[in-house]
Regions:
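Sec/Tat signal peptide C-region and signal peptidase I cleavage site
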Residues: 16-20
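Bacterial N-terminal signal peptides
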Residues: 7-15
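Structural microenvironment flanking redox-active thiols in thiol-disulfide oxidoreductases
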Residues: 68-106, 119-122
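Short, internal strand/loop/helix patches
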Residues: 89, 104-138
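Short active-site neighborhood of thiol/selenol oxidoreductases, capturing the structured segment around
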Residues: 47-68
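Positively charged n-region of N-terminal signal peptides that target proteins for export
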Residues: 1-4
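N-terminal "domain-start" segment that seeds a small globular fold
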Residues: 21-47
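Thiol-/selenol-based redox modules, centered on thioredoxin-like
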Residues: 134-188
């Protein structure tokens, strides 16, 4: 009898799990999700409040090799457009102890938060690492990009779209990054 009850319970739990509502994936034109998270200084990042002031680029990312190579382009995007009112918020999946060293070596200038449980990915309806969501002033999703491009193409395209939202001149993000790169000297 116990085996029948356990078997029935397992069958029902699998059935309910399979029919549970998945988080809906966002599309361009959708309202941005309700999103709040504390940054690494303990200050609340509230997407709705930020989007009232101007466009916000939310980047859900990690410190993997591809994301790491792409990071300078997003830092350049942040620097290029912050005076235009565009905010960049990066949410990293790393735990505190691993991230502290990473943040120090990368000299991050954008606002960032940590979410090792990846709740932010669920809120934005994605499992892709990294994922970027450009939210226009007022809170509508203006652009979405998923995946990584260490050449900076994703950051440049998002930067161009963000510039268009605030009617600003486009900045050549790649040129900014190339200008800041230190020359590599061969070892003897």
């Amino acid at each position: 009898m116990k085996k029948i009850i356990v078997s029935l319970a397992l069958t029902l739990s699998v059935a309910f799990t399979a029919t549970a509502e998945p988080t809906k994936a966002l599309k361009v034109g959708d309202d941005a999700p309700e999103f709040k998270i504390k940054d690494t200084n303990g200050k609340e990042i509230n997407l709705a409040k930020l989007a009232k002031k101007g466009p916000v680029l939310v980047r859900l990312t990690c410190g993997c090799l591809g994301c790491d190579r792409e990071l300078p382009y997003f830092q350049a995007l942040h620097e290029a457009y912050k005076k235009e009112g565009i905010r960049l918020v990066a949410v990293f999946a790393e735990p505190d102890e691993k991230f502290a060293k990473y943040a120090k070596t990368k000299k991050l200038k954008m606002q960032y938060a940590l979410d090792p449980k990846k709740n932010s990915w669920q809120i934005f309806g994605t499992k892709t690492m990294p994922s970027n969501f450009l939210i226009e002033k007022g809170g509508k999703v203006a652009a979405i990009s998923k995946g990584c491009d260490p050449s900076g193409l994703i950051a440049r395209n998002l930067g161009d779209k963000a510039a268009k939202l605030v009617k600003a001149n486009k900045v050549d993000i790649k040129a900014q990054v190339d200008k800041n790169k230190k020359p590599v000297t061969p070892k003897k």
